[in-house]
Amino acid sequence: MLFLDKVSKRYADNTDALNGVSLLIKPKEFVSIVGHSGAGKTTLLKMILAEEKPTEGDVTFENINIHKIRKSDMNEYRRRIGTVFQDFRLLADKTAYENVAFAMEAAGRTEEEIHADVPHVLELVDLGTKMHNFPHQLSGGEKQRVAIARAIVNQPDIIIADEPTGNLDPKTAYEIVQILKKINDLGTTVILTTHNTGVVDHIGKRVISMRDGMVVMDSDKGEFVV
């Protein structure tokens, strides 16, 4: 599904953010990427999202090099990926329902589809009773649930969650991880980055450990090093 082949990234100041990273991520996998700040986790995600180009190596999705495709095809590729961030990135003047609906509108979905799908995904993340609340009326965990609902509402193949529990207390972080696991169980590939080893312990699936821009361990048994 997603293959990184000897991917390296060197910036203008000669900093090596990635150094020869090779990974194969299969459909329906749940993959956690762990490492301290500066390990290369965020740069790796930017490669997958085609926000940055590698200095060396290739990133392919379904055997297509994503850094060599046309702009129209790039838009289609990005529609197949949902993103969740540490800082939620919700629209402050829109309710939870409207934030999720906005993602569907941007994708050209119909009003009928929006009315059917938005309540469904908000129920899926256990936020059905607060769909008409504004972000300032929600807790941090609830805001992240809205962000997850927004990420999955257009039925992407992959969810990329970049430090999704970074601003949350341990109990709420566990709840968010359980929601991501539920989404994965429904067939969506999930790629999660974190520096919180406790989060990884709760998941118990494949873990990729990074250090100094390199993969130092890749375990299907939930084992990791930092």
Model regions and ranges:
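Catalytic Walker B motif of ABC-type/P-loop ATPase nucleotide-binding domains
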Residues: I159-D162
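Helix-to-loop junction immediately C-terminal to a conserved catalytic motif
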Residues: L49
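Conserved catalytic motifs of ABC-family nucleotide-binding domains
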Residues: Q155
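Short coil-to-helix segment of the ABC ATPase nucleotide-binding domain corresponding to the Q-loop/switch region
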Residues: K94-A101
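Conserved ABC ATPase signature
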Residues: F134-L138, E142
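The feature captures the beta-strand-to-loop junction immediately N-terminal to the Walker
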Residues: V34-H36
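Conserved ABC transporter NBD signature motif
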Residues: G57-N65, Y77
